[in-house]
Amino acid sequence: MRLLPMKRIATVFPLLIFALVNLPIPSVAGQFTVTTVYDGDTIKAQGHDIIIYVLLAGIDAPEIAFQEQQGQPYAQEAKRYLEKLILNKRVDIKGYGLGPYPYNHLIGEVRLKGTIINIAMIKNGLAEACHEMPPDGLNIAPYREAEREAMEAKRG
């Protein structure tokens, strides 16, 4: 067996690392158990011998008070409702990439028994459809429709 010269390894290795780092995150992350709900749109889940932090895709829930930052109205209600829906339950998470630095959470759509939890948060008036550019591959139309329905029903 012939060994590669060091110069060739030194050239190929950085390219390999670059390729691995820039691989897209798989579209489907799989089934996980939700272990923590931080607020109305951020969770921690465990499964497949890993722990992931997930920012619910396509929604924006009220922010909870943190350090010197004041909380927004209905933040605790949104957190409690999300806990009621999915805490300690096995969910399917479909990933759409990573969120911005410094958190780099997986941006994901969470399903429980066929219900898209992200949309359920909007329908119940505890989150709004995200008005920024949605992640690639996420169909934002049902989110905006849920928001319209919630507003007409005066929820949230």
Regions found by a protein language model. Give the residues of each.
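Small beta-barrel nucleic-acid-binding modules, primarily SNase/OB-fold domains
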Residues: 2-14, 19-156
